[in-house]
């Protein structure tokens, strides 16, 4: 059985959740072994808990939608979201990533 390594890191605002790149990446936060990688990602303009590991099985089971792992996000917005905006989140919304449109799954959204 392999001796996998697991690290938990609070990713600060302004840092990319990746190890490659010239600046503003996880390699500037701590000196991690070269074989580990983040499970999932957080955008540069977000902060939060990030699991870093070399366990490919765990990574697959946590990220593959087939396994249905629930995620919780806390967000800060300007103003108070309307009832209509909250319902749109609950129903799923269309987003664009790198020019490609995606429809998000329905979610639990509350204030």
Where are these regions (language model features)?
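RNA pseudouridine synthases
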Residues: 1-111
